[in-house]
Amino acid sequence: MMGVNAAPAARSDPVSMAPQLYNKVSDDGWHLSIQIRGEVVNSVPNLAAAANSREAFVTATASATASGGSSPIQESLFILGYQLGCQSDVSAGLVVGGTAGIAGSVGLPSASVGGSVGAAGYVQTILQPGVIVDLPMTNMALNSAGRATLSVDNLHIKADACGGDVNIRSYAYFRISTEAAHTSYAIYGDPIKI
């Protein structure tokens, strides 16, 4: 008995991404720093083998610090996440339809017989412009020493119903609030196709 085995889907090697760092001084004198380091993106074949779905596993560490300000920090938020860009949104799905028919004829007096067969069909989808979504992975507030560290290790990212390329990029968002000012800023990793 002979069988046909499909070759396994190609698998990419994990990619180490460049570290990112951004320092800033707020209007009320806080020295702020955020960074992303140790980022690895492992793009893998889609588990369902769907042609319009992409998957990856991500690892990254982000840290934030705040020091030297004149007004105490009343509230803070630090987020590590990913942005995912889908080239074309095909979530409306496919519509398949058609018609078919058979027609016959008989001619007299020559006793001729004839017939015809016809079919028409279509496949239709609604292509919408690409979309970009935020995928916050984890968050926390600064501790009493003005520090926060966030880590994700081998977390799953997936995109379904995407026609064309799917790209992701990491981000770290940092916000502090004092009586004198509210400061928000972010850094972004390099985009990578998954």
Task: Give the residues covered by each predicted segment.
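Primarily mature extracellular domains of secreted and cell-surface proteins
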Residues: 13-194
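Secretory targeting and sorting signals
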Residues: 1-12
